[in-house]
Amino acid sequence: PEEIEDKLNSLPLVSECLVIQSGEKLIALVHPDYDEVHKAALSDEELQKQMEANRRELNAMVNSYEQISGFRLYEEEFEKTPKRSIKRFLYADAEI
């Protein structure tokens, strides 16, 4: 998932993300760059549309088995370890 996350993190309005598996599907958990969202004066609906555009753009860059089938936005930054890596285990069972 790290390769997919690196690509997703480079897309517009993404501050950080985490890719998890839900059944057979990959789901992106995304913390948007709210500073950029506010600068662009985007509504929640426009933010959702941009994230869907990001999902489609990402899926065009990766193999079919790496494609993201959905995403969920997180308002808060993900919890991190002292080394600043995301505590993945906290989000493994995230509801989509």
Mark where each language-model region is.
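Short alpha-helical basic/polar micro-motif
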Residues: D6, P12, P82
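Conserved C-terminal "lid"/linker of ANL adenylate-forming enzymes
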Residues: E16, E24, R55-I96
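C-terminal boundary motif of the adenylate-forming
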Residues: S10-Y34, N59-A60
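A short, flexible beta-alpha/helix-coil linker loop
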Residues: Q21, D33-H38, E76-K80
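Well-ordered, non-membrane alpha-helical segments in soluble/globular domains
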Residues: D44-R55
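Short alpha-helical interface patches
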Residues: Y34-A41, A92-I96
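Adenylate-forming
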Residues: P1-K7, E36-E46, N63-I68, S85
